[in-house]
Amino acid sequence: MELNEIYEYARDHMQKSLDVLKKDFNTLRTGRVTTAVVENIKVDYYGAPTPLNQAASVVAADATTIVISPWDKSLLGEIERAIQEANIGVNPNNDGDQIKLFFPPMTVEQREAEAKKAKQFGEKAKIAIRNVRRDANDKIKKLFKDKAITEDEEKRGLEEVQKITDEFIKKVDDLVKQKEQEIMKV
């Protein structure tokens, strides 16, 4: 394995950590409700736990309403029960044809709690990025130990991995800050 391959490995895996962070952010509630809040709720679909978005059409009708239209109307009760068990802070409104979820405007406390979750997701991403850095550094040190690279190349390699790490940590910080502003905006 060459140094360039190690850098590529580090970039790829750190990018995956960023992608996971963005996915995690989709589950957070902002001033506008998104379908991501309910899409991964599992519904018992003929004995198999199935994500809600695979058993029904899930649409954000407006800033505070999500409409769920199951492909199979016999699932209405099951979907309603799954939403109540998911404890997302709303009661499902079943009209016999579809389920509507009315989300009240977020309170300051709820916004602060969501912002705190955003920070926690950011910390989780930073830990993952640092773990990738550790793995990349270990690979570089092994190359030096096996005499595949010189001491100078080892030093340059470790510095380059640190630069890549700093770049991705900054991206995480920027994303967290942006998400917090989005959450706190009334």
From Swiss-Prot:
| Pfam families for the chain | RRF (PF01765)
List where in the cell it is found.
Cytoplasm
Q: Can you name one GO molecular function term for this protein?
A: ribosomal large subunit binding
Q: Which domain of life is it from?
A: Bacteria
Q: Where are the transmembrane segments?
A: none
Q: What keywords tag this UniProt record?
A: Cytoplasm, Protein biosynthesis
Say yes or no: keyword Mitochondrion present. Answer: no
GO BP of this protein: cytoplasmic translational termination
Q: Which GO terms describe its cellular component?
A: cytosol
Q: Is Heme tagged as a keyword?
A: no
**Job of this protein:** Responsible for the release of ribosomes from messenger RNA at the termination of protein biosynthesis. May increase the efficiency of translation by recycling ribosomes from one round of translation to another.
Report the sequence similarity comment from the record. Answer: Belongs to the RRF family.
PANTHER family per the record? MITOCHONDRIAL RIBOSOME RECYCLING FACTOR PSEUDO 1, RIBOSOME RECYCLING FACTOR
- Kindly provide the name given to this protein in its UniProt entry: Ribosome-recycling factor
Organism, scientific name: Nitratiruptor sp. (strain SB155-2)
GN (gene name): frr
